[in-house]
Structures are given as C-alpha cells and as structure tokens.
A protein has these predicted regions:
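A conserved beta-strand element that flanks and buttresses the S-adenosyl-L-methionine
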Residues: 47, 52, 56
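A short acidic, Gly/Pro-enriched loop at the edge of an enzyme's catalytic core
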Residues: 34-47
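Short, flexible/disordered intra-domain loops and linkers
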Residues: 57-69, 97-103
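A short glycine-rich, Lys/Arg-flanked "PGG" loop and its adjoining helix->strand segment in the class I
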Residues: 64-85
Length: 155
C-alpha cells in the first residue's frame, strides 16, 4: 500500500524503527504513534494499516501501555487537518479483547467510540477472498475479520 501511494505523493512514515527504503518519495522518521511529531490540524491524510492494534502491547519494542491504541487514535485525531482523511484497518470482531502479545480485536461499536469526534465516511470488512459491507459482516459467525474505516474531521 505505501509503495503504491508513494507513486502518487510524498509519504512520511513515522515508526519506532527507521524504515529503510530506496524510494525517494518515502521519508521515514523515528517516532511514537502516541506522540506524533506534528502540529494540531496539520496533516491532510493519515493511514494505519494493521498497526494501531499492536501499540502498547510491547510486541515490536514499544512500551507496555494498555491504552496505547486509544492514545495513538487520539494523536491521529489531533494532527488530522479539517476535511482530511484517516484510513485505518485492524482486527474487528464480535467481542473486544486483547490477544496476548499479538493484537487487539475491537467491536465495530468500540471503533465508533474510539474515533468519536470524527465523521465516518465509509467502512468495509475484509475477508480472505472479498470485501463486504457492515450489513453483510453483521450476519457472519467469525471470531474476527479486518475492519477498514475512512474517517474525516469536520470543522
């Protein structure tokens, strides 16, 4: 995804580890998702694809912090420019839970709560072989799938 997007625009990646790439349109900086190095309302587009569910669990060298995921979401909301977009994807299931040393799974309702203050533009659910709507997802009997969400910040 990042390499594809970098063909269209400059990408700035923030991670606890420096990203090594030869692509000139990807700039990497070391940082913490719970304390982003940007001013309020300054970033037009943010994405977190299979990242925020890990924050605070220590799996990738970060500090243990039960509220790490929410802190990262709050930081994304803080730096997002008005009318900007946040694209996020992470495990979504029927129950909220932490899978030890792996990831968090959130219900769709918890997702809406965590991103309160932003407007939900679209949501889809990724299965291994297709992308489905919320209505279709609600009919499934699966422990979890990947929720894909598009939010914006209104004035």
């Amino acid at each position: 995804f990042v390499a594809f997007a970098a063909q269209l625009t400059l990408i700035e990646s923030v991670d606890i580890r420096l990203l090594s790439t030869s692509m000139k349109t990807i700039k990497s900086k070391i940082g913490d998702a719970t304390s982003l190095p940007y001013q309020n309302n300054s970033v037009n587009a943010l994405s977190s694809l299979s990242v925020i569910e890990h924050i605070g669990l220590g799996r990738y060298g970060d500090e243990i912090d039960y509220d790490g995921m929410q802190k990262a979401i709050d930081e994304m909301k803080r730096v997002l420019a008005f009318n900007g977009m946040i694209l996020v994807a992470f495990p979504v299931g029927k129950k909220n839970k932490v899978v030890f040393n792996a990831h968090r799974i959130c219900t769709p309702e918890k997702v809406y709560m965590m991103f309160n203050g932003l407007k939900l533009i679209d949501e889809k659910y990724a299965l291994s072989d297709k992308i489905i709507s919320k209505k279709e997802y609600d009919k499934l009997d699966r422990p979890y799938s990947y929720g894909c969400y598009y939010f914006t910040k209104l004035k």
